C-alpha cells in the first residue's frame, strides 16, 4: 500500500478577536516533511498509524506537512489557502497513492471558508479520483458537514474527552481505509443531528455508558460509531452534536442506528445541563472545602476552547478573600514576560498583567511582583510530547504565584509549574486555565476540583446556528 498523510487543523471560536495566523501555527505545530518527531500527537494519529504499517508491513508512506494551531479566532483566508495548497501540492507529487489519511480537527473556520475540512477533502478527492480511499481522523469537538461525508470514504472521531484515544482512532481509520482500498468493505456514512449544544465529558455518566454502547455496536456490518460533540463557541450552520455511523454497504442500517442513538443522546440532555453555581458562589464554596490542594478551573478563559488565557478574574477573587497560598497558570502575556526577562530573577517589578486581548479578557491587573524564575522555551509534557509555552516567567505577589507564558496554551500537566521550580502540590489552590484536559496530568496530584465560570452565551449571540437547539430552545423533540 502507498499512503499519503498530512495534518491541518485548529478549533475556531468565531467570536474570538485572536486571529489564527502564521504565528499560531508556528507556536503549536508547523512541521514540514521529515520534521515530525518520533512520538504521536493529538493531531497526527493517522501519521503515527502509517509509520507503524511502514515498519511492520512495508507500506510506502509519504508524509506531508503537519500544521495545527491552538484554538482561536478565524484563520485568515490566505493562511488557510497557503497551507491547504501546500498539502495538495505534496499529494500531487506523491501520486499515485492507494490511501489518503488526514489528521483534521473538524471545527476549523477561515474568514471566507466556514467548512475548511470539507473544502480540503473536496480538493483531495478532485486530485485522486474515486478509486483512492480517502479518510480523516477528527477531534470530537467538530462540525460534521454533509460535504465532509460526501468527499471522504471514512471519517473517524475521537471517542474520549479528555482526548486520550487519538492513537487508537488513527489505527481504526487506517484499518478501515485499507479494507476499503482492498474492496473488503464499502463504507457508507449517515449522520443524525442531536440538536444540542452541550459538554460531553466521557469520564463520567451518562456519557461513559454511551461510549461503551457505541463501541459495543461496532460489529460488522457496523464499522464505526462516533458522537460528534460539536463546538459551542462557533456560530456556524453545522454546529451542534451529531451521531455518525459508518456501515458496510447498508446505508439504511447506518441511518437507523444513528437516529436511535441521537434520540438517546437527546433524552439525556437534562442530565448534561450544567448545575454549577455562578463564579462568585462557586469560589465561596471552594474556600469552605477542606481538600488541599484544590484545583480551581478557570473554564471561561480556557485557551483550549479559543479563549485568550489572559483573564485576571480568578486572581481578583483570590485577592479579595486574602488567599495567600495559590498558584495559577498559564496566563498569556508576552509583554509581561519580556519585562520579567529584562528585570531578571529577583527583580521587584510593577507589572500590568493580563486583560489585553479583548472584551472577554476583562481588565488588566496592576501588581508589584517578584520575578522568581525565568525559562526560555518552556513546555509541558503531554504524553511524551512537548506542548510549547515559549519563554515563561514565574512571578509572586501577595502569596500568589503566576506562570506567565509567551505562547498561548491551556494547562495539561504539573510540569507547567515544576519547570519553573514551583511545587503546585504544596499550594492550597491550583488555578488552571483548562476545562477537561488538565485531568491528563493533575489527577495524579489531586482528584478534587471546582469549576469557576460565567453563564453561557445567550441565544442572541448565535445568528447562523440551526434551530431549534437545546438549551437555547427547550420545548421541542427530535423527529
Model-predicted regions and their roles:
Residues 65-86:
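Charged, often glycine-rich, active-site loop that binds/positions anionic groups
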Residues 2-4, 60-62, 98-100, 132-136, ...:
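Structural motif
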Residues 1-56:
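N-terminal amphipathic/basic leader segments beginning at the initiator methionine
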Residues 181-210:
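Internal, active-site/partner-interface "lid" segment
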Residues 63, 85, 263-266, 378-479:
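Extended hydrophobic packing segments that form well-structured cores
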Residues 4, 8-11, 15-17, 77-84, ...:
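Active-site histidine-anchored catalytic micro-motif
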Residues 200-399, 403:
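Hard-cation-handling environments
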Residues 56-63, 89-100, 282-294:
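Glycine-rich phosphate/diphosphate-binding loops that line cofactor/substrate pockets in enzymes
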Amino acid at each position: 500500500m502507498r499512503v499519503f498523510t498530512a495534518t491541518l487543523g485548529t478549533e475556531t471560536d468565531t467570536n474570538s478577536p485572536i486571529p489564527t495566523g502564521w504565528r499560531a501555527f508556528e507556536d503549536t505545530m508547523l512541521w514540514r516533511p521529515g520534521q515530525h518527531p518520533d512520538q504521536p500527537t493529538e493531531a497526527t494519529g493517522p501519521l503515527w498509524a502509517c509509520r507503524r504499517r511502514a515498519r511492520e508491513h512495508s507500506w510506502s508512506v509519504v508524509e506531508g506537512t503537519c500544521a495545527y494551531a491552538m484554538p482561536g479566532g478565524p484563520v485568515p483566508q490566505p493562511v488557510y489557502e497557503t497551507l491547504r495548497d501546500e498539502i495538495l501540492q505534496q499529494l500531487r507529487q506523491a501520486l499515485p497513492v492507494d490511501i489518503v489519511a488526514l489528521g483534521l480537527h473538524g471545527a476549523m473556520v477561515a474568514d471566507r471558508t466556514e467548512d475548511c475540512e470539507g473544502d480540503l477533502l473536496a480538493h483531495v478527492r478532485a486530485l485522486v479520483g474515486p478509486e483512492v480511499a480517502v479518510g480523516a481522523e477528527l477531534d470530537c469537538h467538530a462540525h460534521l458537514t454533509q460535504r465532509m461525508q460526501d468527499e471522504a470514504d471514512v471519517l473517524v472521531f475521537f471517542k474520549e474527552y479528555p482526548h486520550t484515544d487519538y492513537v487508537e482512532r488513527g489505527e481504526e481509520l487506517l484499518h478501515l481505509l485499507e479494507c476499503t482500498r482492498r474492496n473488503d468493505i464499502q463504507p457508507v456514512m449517515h449522520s443524525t443531528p442531536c440538536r444540542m449544544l452541550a459538554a460531553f465529558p466521557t469520564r463520567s455518566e451518562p456519557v461513559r455508558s454511551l461510549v461503551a454502547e457505541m463501541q459495543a455496536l461496532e460489529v460488522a456490518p457496523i464499522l464505526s460509531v462516533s458522537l460528534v460533540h460539536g463546538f459551542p463557541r462557533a456560530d456556524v450552520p453545522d454546529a451542534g452534536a451529531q451521531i455518525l455511523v459508518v456501515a458496510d454497504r447498508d446505508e439504511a442500517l447506518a441511518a437507523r442506528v444513528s437516529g436511535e442513538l441521537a434520540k438517546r443522546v437527546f433524552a439525556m440532555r437534562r442530565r448534561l445541563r450544567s448545575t454549577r453555581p455562578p463564579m462568585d458562589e462557586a469560589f465561596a464554596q471552594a474556600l469552605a472545602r477542606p481538600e488541599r490542594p484544590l484545583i480551581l478551573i478557570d473554564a471561561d478563559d480556557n485557551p483550549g476552547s479559543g479563549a485568550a488565557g489572559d483573564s485576571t478574574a480568578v486572581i481578583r477573587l483570590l485577592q479579595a478573600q486574602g488567599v495567600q497560598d495559590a498558584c495559577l497558570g498559564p496566563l498569556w502575556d508576552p509583554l509581561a514576560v519580556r519585562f520579567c526577562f529584562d528585570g531578571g530573577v529577583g527583580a521587584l517589578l510593577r507589572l500590568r498583567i493580563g486583560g489585553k486581548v479583548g472584551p472577554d479578557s476583562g481588565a488588566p491587573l496592576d501588581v508589584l511582583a517578584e520575578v522568581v524564575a525565568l525559562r526560555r522555551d518552556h513546555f509541558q509534557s503531554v504524553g511524551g510530547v512537548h506542548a510549547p509555552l515559549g519563554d515563561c516567567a514565574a512571578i509572586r505577589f501577595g502569596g500568589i504565584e503566576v506562570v506567565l507564558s509567551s505562547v498561548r496554551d491551556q494547562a495539561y500537566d504539573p510540569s507547567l509549574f515544576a519547570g519553573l521550580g514551583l511545587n503546585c502540590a504544596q499550594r492550597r489552590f491550583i488555578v488552571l486555565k483548562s476545562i477537561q484536559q488538565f485531568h491528563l496530568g493533575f489527577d495524579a496530584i489531586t482528584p478534587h476540583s471546582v469549576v469557576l465560570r460565567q453563564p453561557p452565551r445567550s441565544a442572541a449571540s448565535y445568528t447562523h446556528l440551526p434551530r431549534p437547539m437545546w438549551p437555547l430552545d427547550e420545548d421541542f423533540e427530535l423527529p
